[in-house]
Swiss-Prot record:
The chain crosses the membrane at residues 156-176. Keywords: Membrane, Mitochondrion, Transit peptide, Transmembrane, Transmembrane helix. The keyword Transit peptide applies. GO terms for cellular component: mitochondrial membrane. This is Altered inheritance of mitochondria protein 39, mitochondrial. The lineage of its organism: Eukaryota, Fungi, Dikarya, Ascomycota, Saccharomycotina. Signal peptide: none annotated. It is a single-pass membrane protein.
Amino acid sequence: MWGLCKNHFPSNKIQVQERNKALKPKKSGSEHKTKQLFPVFNCKKKEKGVMIRFAILRNANTSLLSARSICLFTQAPTYCHVRLNTLNKSITTKRNSLTESKRHVHDGKHFFTTPHQQQQTKLGEIEEGHSPNIKGEDLRSIGQAITHQRNKRRKQIWSAIFGGIFGVILGYSLIYRVIYLKEQSFLPLFPSSKIRKLSTRDLKKVDVNQVQKLSKLRVLEILSGHDMIKEQYGVPLLDKDGNSPTLNEFSMWCEDQDPCVTGIVMEPDDKRDSSHTWYRIPFVCKWRITHRPISIRGTIDDLLNRIGLETADLFEIISPERVYGSFKYEYPLQGDSHALHLWFHGEIELDDDSLIVYNGKYHVDVKLQEIDLFRREKNGQLIQYVLYKNEAGDK
């Protein structure tokens, strides 16, 4: 019998027998007997249903319930269908797992945000109707965030380095040397010029008036023997009023022989009187700002003495000639372990258009370095005449 299970099925025994007679094919006897004994099921896929071919014994009593059971059995999925569905499900599961794993991969783009949050932001903007250049804005914001984080990290590292160095130096200078050892400590801050003005304490040790008088006498002595001064101004040298020339300006300063630094001197707070002006931290220390030279030779000697050596063990220093004007015979300030050059500068006015300018050094006696005459000529030009210069002097 040929029947379409989806659309039609025989409802009684008589219709089944008549249908079998009409559709009975003419075949050999052996083949016909075999098909009467064993029903044959052959499934073919079509667009609207499944065509089922089955044979039923002519004398068999088949009820409607049994026929419907046969139809339902034939419509059940075959092994091929089950296998195909299993493969499709496994492939779909693998694809979903790969997609989920890719979502959780942390790359440089999602350094501060997760892909899930970024996807929600994009969906929200699209739903609201906004369509900006999301990719460019994200890249710029991420780049700015990374740059800000690097700069912040760099500042933290440098702050830690400088803070550690400052803490070590301050701890050694203040806590160890001043508080523990009860000694004076010097903390250098920045380099300073070797030339500086005399402090109030230094001026107390130098007789400025004596230097001023001696320098004026030495200048007048040299000018009186100069040919140009004899011819144009005469001897003895007088000013425009016919009196002895007077000093219009005189100043002094000092020059260290070694490089100098400006720093802080700290001592224990012993409340003793001192000629310096101190700032006090009660019960801790007192401090002031001062200038100090850096003696390279003295530093080397100190390092060698700490390891049990002396300078003479490594090299021999031959002292230069004791020539007047060298640092060997310069003016040492009391309480200082280094020598200083004491320089002076003065001006003497001869008339309205002539001015004598000189400078030199002082050590027990005055030593002039240079004497110049500044004169305004009739054509209005200001000309400098070098009247005296000590070529052997050290400036």
